[in-house]
Swiss-Prot record:
Keyword Membrane attached: no
Domain Fe2OG dioxygenase: 78-180
Protein name as annotated: PKHD-type hydroxylase xcc-b100_1388
InterPro entries: Oxoglu/Fe-dep_dioxygenase_dom, PKHD_C, PKHD_hydroxylase, Pro_4_hyd_alph, Pro_4_hyd_alph_FE2OG_OXY
A GO biological-process term: DNA damage response
Cofactor: Fe(2+); L-ascorbate
Cofactor note as given: Binds 1 Fe(2+) ion per subunit.
EC number assigned by the record: 1.14.11.-
């Protein structure tokens, strides 16, 4: 399921985040890439262990915790701490597939995170740069994504994807991965659509007895499928 989620960051959060990132020291993004990705990757990345990266990551995680749409669509069990990248001067990231497992070392260990869902949070206004589209090979064809600052897109971690060259301006984004309670994308899509329908029915016909039944179906399916 490829899903744009608008306004994950408030204007105040976005301004605070950009202020921190604009003052940061960036490194060559290939340092953190795997063998396959390093051959396709040309960007700058904020070192994961820098104080600014940790502060910015915490801000993004706090914003995600307040997004009911994100929770409903991703059903997160674990979230890899958000990372940050920057593209300018023709930089790009060729077609690649994300590693199936990432190791979260933010708490001193090496906790595995299965990358069921990939996510990109756009931090630059689309009018401020040319190119930089996130191109995703989806089951429904090729999708090109370039969202307003503060908007998020999530998509299956199995997807082949790339970032087009940025030919003017600078594209800054956060990217991260989610280990979902449901590793199967079709099951996540089904439960998301069911949850959206329940929410709409609750608004249109509050108190309808069928809502209790539908809510029960949702939770029973989640109980059957969830890996917790």
């Amino acid at each position: 399921m490829l899903l744009p989620i608008p306004d994950v960051l408030t204007p105040a959060q976005l301004s605070q985040l950009r202020e921190r990132l604009d003052a940061a020291d960036w490194a060559d993004g290939r340092i953190t890439a795997g063998h396959q990705s390093a051959q396709a990757k040309d960007n700058a990345q904020l070192p994961e262990d820098s104080p600014i990266a940790r502060e910015a990551s915490a801000l993004v995680l706090d914003a995600l915790s307040r997004s009911s749409t994100f929770f409903s669509a991703a059903l997160p069990r674990r979230i890899y701490p958000p990372l940050f990248n920057r593209y300018s001067g023709g930089q790009s990231f060729g077609y690649h597939v994300d590693n199936a497992v990432r190791y979260d070392r933010s708490r001193g260990g090496a906790d595995p995170v299965r990358t069921d869902v990939s996510a990109t949070l756009f931090l630059s206004d689309p009018e401020s740069y040319d190119g930089g589209e996130l191109v995703i090979e989806d089951t429904y064809g090729t999708q090109s994504v370039k969202l307003p600052a503060g908007h998020l897109v999530i998509y299956p971690g199995t997807s082949l994807h790339k970032v087009m060259p940025v030919t003017r301006g600078t594209r800054v984004a956060s990217f991260f991965w989610i280990q979902s309670m449901l590793r199967n994308d079709a099951q996540r899509r089904l439960l998301f659509e069911l949850d959206v329908s329940i929410r709409r029915l609750t608004q249109d016909t509050p108190g309808h007895p069928s809502l209790i039944q539908l809510t029960g179906v949702y939770h029973n399916l989640l109980r059957q499928w969830a890996d917790v």
